[in-house]
């Protein structure tokens, strides 16, 4: 009898209710089983989830459900990264309070995530804008302040004069504010900083312990930390060229071996010498102001056009008093890095070469590539940056660059310049302290108080939390906290006099730098419960986009170490395993030059070609490239629409099945339809065979077709488990397709009443295995299938969500036959399939029976047959 079609809408709502009523996924910290903590990067509540969220959280859910089935006590929580500028922008544009906007979005997105059937412990949910959360963050801030890990200092920042706020380097686009479009200014502001540089060496060394992280991410962090070993060299200014009070410039270089290729010295626009020279020099002042219009990051400097201003000053070469180098103020040197001054060697640094060509400076190669002739070697448009031997470098000629480095360092360390060594070896880091001050309302208030008499002091712990006031106005740019009539006025905790609150709020990256620790005991009054934190941390598997490779992941690594110093955790690293998934991408479509949504078009096959037209008008639509889903290009697929049309399981299955998880997955309607057909096929096969299998005890077959069924199922259990352990979800999905194909004929026999007792036992076991293996990917379908089979696994009533992972029999997984390549005179001619335990004589006899061997021997006998056990056979004719 044909089964009714599977109805995902009904089944998914039912099983989600069952899981919730049974509190199936709530985690007990006191559970004695081995722990496993799986976490996906928590979302910003922008309004609705997108398909990227579906893929990210589906992957995490597969891991959580699998590990739960393997007997682990799994922590799989969810929360909201809820502070940030978009809420304030919405407040200004839509006249809605950031708090209201944020919590409305959280409610919508929580409903959407619940509709996915994720095995989340919602009892631990929090939003970073919850007072209860940022209260503990303020406690942490004060703890770190008292440990000397928080400081306040002036710093160059990107200032948006329209929005009246500091912008992160990433928010400066072509010199303009990403939202206002205003030309960004560099300003010196007093800011709060976390002293991440105290941990530079630790953060770098710790990368070597993270063997379950992608090498690409570790390399990105290694480069961002940017440890370099170099030489700090004092260069004397040529007499008569420098202003009074200046006699030298100190440069930092990682390539002192190339000093004989030097063509210029470049100093920062903020170097004391540049500032002095700009007094009364309108042209230089104008150039310095232009330098201040670009971003403050190294990345911004590296991408900007290289410009310089010749100061007329000269410095003496450290090895030749008669050799003078011009000094430029340059827009690619930052005062905060090194000494704010560098020497340029155009032949062996691309930036220096571009600069030298622009200003017609001499280019002298001093490193000769292997195989080149020193007399004829020259530099064209590309600098030579690899190894070689030194040339044009006097006493360094013939040395390797490494040897030349040490020779230069040794000589200059021994050379006296005005009573001090002319050079010292120095280790530098690119990493800079983390400025966390933001001139924004919707963030965690910094718990500090400013008093003219007593200075700056922390808010007393008894007065925490410092709550954001609700009665603020968003009628103009800037920080509403600065304008609040009462909130910023407070009494000094030391003298009792009038004082003011800190009105800057914390960078939202602070909120996400410790949330994984809060999930371990979110009900505690202290930021963490040390016992719970030490039990659960580090996170065993963290999943999120590679766009967070540096900032979020590096800040989290710092914060874990800082919290350890403050006594809140006992680990150094927050995330043991890291997986960075690919994006969900989609075709783009245009009609009349405008982007159009996939929901508004029809695509048909006409004469073998895909043709798109508008649904409403029939107008032709241009099918464009496949790109990341974005609202601007309207190639977004709404998960709500997919779940309403196909069900959550199909959305999950598709994003897991179509591509390796680290690569992008292309969303297609055809792919979703294919997943839908597969779901219906599984349901039909199980539901139609269920009456014959419901009361049968599972038992592996021992012979014939029943043995084949059991072998296929047991092999799949081993393989799918291995695939999930490796996060190779697409391979696991492919194996389940194969297993369904293998079982389909036998299941149909059972449905038709044609299966014998042994086959029924084998099918009952194999079908249970199929259901349990499908469960991490398609949990609702799995529950519905098991219910159809009587709700039992191995004879015991259970939910699939609480059932153990099936156990394979090693004897059924081992192949009894092997395929051996057969060579004739060293060239492969075919294969031999034979019993794995066949002896050498049996193999030799079987080889002689092969048609292609008989043909090659032409009635004769071989000189010999060489058998390499389990590997290969070679017939010498």
Curated annotation (Swiss-Prot):
Main location per the UniProt record: cytoplasm
EC number(s) from the headed UniProt entry: 6.1.1.4
GO MF term list: aminoacyl-tRNA deacylase activity; ATP binding; leucine-tRNA ligase activity
Keywords tagged on the record: Aminoacyl-tRNA synthetase, ATP-binding, Cytoplasm, Ligase, Nucleotide-binding, Protein biosynthesis
Chain positions recorded as ATP binding sites: 631
InterPro entries recorded: aa-tRNA-synth_I_CS, aa-tRNA-synth_Ia, Leu-tRNA-ligase, Leu_tRNA-synth_edit, M/V/L/I-tRNA-synth_anticd-bd, Methionyl/Leucyl_tRNA_Synth, Rossmann-like_a/b/a_fold, tRNAsynth_Ia_anticodon-bd
Motif 'HIGH' region boundaries: 43-53
Claim: Hydrolase is one of the keywords in the record: no
GO CC entries: cytosol
Reactions it catalyzes: tRNA(Leu) + L-leucine + ATP = L-leucyl-tRNA(Leu) + AMP + diphosphate
Family in the record: Belongs to the class-I aminoacyl-tRNA synthetase family.
Protein name, UniProt field: Leucine--tRNA ligase
Organism: Brucella canis (strain ATCC 23365 / NCTC 10854 / RM-666)
Gene name per UniProt: leuS
